[in-house]
Amino acid sequence: MPGLSVSTVFFKFSSFHVSAQDDDAVAATAAAEANLVKIGILQFAPHASLDNCYEGIIEGLKNTGFIDGISATIEFVNGMGEIETNNLAAASFVSKNYDMIIAIATPSAVAAYAAARDAQIPVVFSAVSDPVSAGLVRSLDFPDTGATGTTDTLNFDGQLKMIRVFLPEAKTIGVLYTTSEANSISQIESLTEAAKDYDFEIKTVGITDASEVAMGAAQLIAEKIDVMNNVTDNNVVNNFSVVTNATDPAGIPIFGSEIEQVARYGCVASESLDYVALGILTGEMAGEILKGEDVMTMPVRVVKDSFPVYNSEIMSKFELQLPADYASATDVAGAR
């Protein structure tokens, strides 16, 4: 046989051998991926505190042995503050038969639970202020619905004390909130009750969507408020520059509900929750459930610890001095 023919036969055999190896590798990879735990993570909107939750969740999952591409397949969707986008993402996770959905913020948690309930896919939520009122669990101690997670309980006593010390002459606190966010309504009820002990009057304006934020802020200013206090309202936080564009020229300072609102968004100070830590706890709970713990009986875990932060640059805009009571608080000016 001529040399050319021998080379050709050898080449064809080698190509067949390599092709078979490639097919085997693809099949092995597909089989391995099929055996990975599939987790969908749904975040309501792109703002800093929820981003911190997501960061913590990934760390918490890792702490319990679930790492994307190694022991789990994790798909992340940001709902961009749109209810319909959140609903579609949750339905997509269910249609793909995911093993779990982790939802960040109340609207995402409600969407995930509505989609996953009949499919009996466990839902673990993070940063949901009142999961009972939102219809996610029967009680904090015994969820009994197929959903559990973490709740961010704001330290209103600490927050009101801070406002009173920073602004001893203040009498009225304004709050802007979204009427469809159950967490905001619950927080305002708690804030209003706590305000009685600090001689504050709470004035609120409810809005329905982002297009009404500017109008709502203007209405609060017209109410002659002395200061604003921001809760964890996703719609308001996601459009916070619209609020400060109205309040800053009016000389009305805003106190935030967590560190990012002080470091990034223009709030003066806050008794802040640590949303990375909240996310870590959420991720670890999710990992425990994936390893066999019962989502029906795992209690909702409440995070209450807060720490004081302030922004010296924002304080200067309002000619405020740091009170002696907060000398040990953390200045987050320029920290982000």
Task: Name every feature range the model reports, one short phrase each.
Residues 1-336:
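Short hydrophobic alpha-helices and adjacent helix-cap/hinge residues
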